C-alpha cells in the first residue's frame, strides 16, 4: 500500500499543561532527527497530533523509525485522496483489498472538519459502507469491536483514509527530562537501564570505561554498537570513552583484595560525576539490580555512593534477571550483550569481593591511592564519539578481531 501520510498521536503529553507546547516541539525535533535521512519527508507538529507527509518515501521504512520515538502513543498510515466520493471509494477499495480477509467484519468512522464538504458523516458512513459490502460480499458490518475500522477524515486540503493504529514507544520525548550520564558496560543490564531512562525523557550520554590492554578492541566496539542500538530511540547519542587502566592497576597494587571492586566503583562514580558537571548532566544512571552481584548490595551501594551527592538512578534495581533479559531482547541488545568480551568490571575481579563493605574501612584503604591525580589523568584521556542509530562498529573491526583469534 502506497501511503501518503502518517498521523502521529501523543501519549502522556496530554497531561503536561503549560509545558505541552515545549514537549510537542521536542517530539517534533526528535521525529525530524529520527527521519533525517529521508530527505523528502515533511514533519508538521500541532497541538493534537503530528502529520508526517511522505512525499513518495517508503512508508514501511518510516514506520519502523517512528516505532522507536519516545513520546508517541500510536500512529496511523494514511492515504490522501481527492475530495470526491469516487476518489474515496477507489482509495477504500485499494485499502480493503489488502486488509479485509473473508469473514472479517468492518465499520466506517468519518470525521468532517471541513463543514463545507457536501457529504456529511452519516451519509459518508452509509454510502461507503454499502460500497464496500457490494465489493466484499463475504464480509459484514459490525458497529462494536469490528476487525477493521476504516477511518475517513475530511479536511480542507483533502480526504484521508486509514485503517491501522500502530502502537508507538510511549513514554516522554527524549530531552524533556534533562540530561543523564549512563554508566554503560558491555553487559545485559546497563543498556536496558539506559533504554528505560530514555523512555522517561532523559537525554542519555553513554560513559564507558576502557582498560587496555586488559580489555580488547572488541569490548570497546561492542559498547559502541550497544550505544547505536540505544541511539535508535533518540537519533544519536554521545559515547564517552574513559581510560581506566592506571586506576585499576593502582587499586590492585595498593588496596586489599576484598575492597578492590568497591574502590574501583567509587573511582568510576567520581569520574562520571566530573563528566556530568562538565556536560550539564543532572543525574547518574546505572544498571544495578539489588542483590545481583557483590557490588549491588545495599551496603555496597552505600559505600560507593559516599563519593557524591548527585542523584544515582537505577531503573532496573527491583527487576529479576529474566525481566531484564526480556526487555533486552525486545530492544535488540541481548545478543550483543552476551558476546564474551571482557569489560573493565570483570578484569581484576577478586574471587571473594566484600558484599558488605564497611564505609570507614573503604575510606581508609582508599587513602592509599592518589585519588585526585588518577582522576585528572583519566579525564585528560577521555574520547567522545557521536553515534548514530544502528551504527555498526563490530564489522569495522573484523580485521583486528581476526588477528586476535
UniProtKB/Swiss-Prot annotation:
Organism annotation: Pediococcus pentosaceus (strain ATCC 25745 / CCUG 21536 / LMG 10740 / 183-1w)
Catalytically driven reaction(s): [ThiI sulfur-carrier protein]-S-sulfanyl-L-cysteine + a uridine in tRNA + 2 reduced [2Fe-2S]-[ferredoxin] + ATP + H(+) = [ThiI sulfur-carrier protein]-L-cysteine + a 4-thiouridine in tRNA + 2 oxidized [2Fe-2S]-[ferredoxin] + AMP + diphosphate; [ThiS sulfur-carrier protein]-C-terminal Gly-Gly-AMP + S-sulfanyl-L-cysteinyl-[cysteine desulfurase] + AH2 = [ThiS sulfur-carrier protein]-C-terminal-Gly-aminoethanethioate + L-cysteinyl-[cysteine desulfurase] + A + AMP + 2 H(+)
Signal peptide from the UniProt entry: none
Pfam families (UniProt xref): ThiI (PF02568), ThiI_fer (PF22025), THUMP (PF02926)
Positions with a binding annotation for ATP: 183-184, 208-209, 265, 287, 296
CDD domains given in the database record: PPase_ThiI, THUMP_ThiI
Entries under Gene3D superfamilies matching the protein: 3.30.2130.30, HUPs
Family per similarity comment: Belongs to the ThiI family.
Domain THUMP span(s) in chain numbering: 60-165
GO molecular function: ATP binding; CCA tRNA nucleotidyltransferase activity; tRNA binding; tRNA-uracil-4 sulfurtransferase activity
Source species, domain of life: Bacteria
UniProtKB keywords: ATP-binding, Cytoplasm, Nucleotide-binding, RNA-binding, Thiamine biosynthesis, Transferase, tRNA-binding
HAMAP family: ThiI
Compartments, as annotated in UniProt: Cytoplasm
Biological pathway: Cofactor biosynthesis; thiamine diphosphate biosynthesis
Entry keyword annotation includes Amino-acid biosynthesis: no
GO BP annotations, alphabetical order: thiamine biosynthetic process; thiamine diphosphate biosynthetic process; thiazole biosynthetic process; tRNA 4-thiouridine biosynthesis
Record GO cellular component, one term: cytosol
E.C. number(s) listed in UniProt: 2.8.1.4
Task of the protein: Catalyzes the ATP-dependent transfer of a sulfur to tRNA to produce 4-thiouridine in position 8 of tRNAs, which functions as a near-UV photosensor. Also catalyzes the transfer of sulfur to the sulfur carrier protein ThiS, forming ThiS-thiocarboxylate. This is a step in the synthesis of thiazole, in the thiamine biosynthesis pathway. The sulfur is donated as persulfide by IscS.
Principal EC category: transferase
Protein name: Probable tRNA sulfurtransferase
PROSITE patterns listed in its UniProt record: THUMP (PS51165)
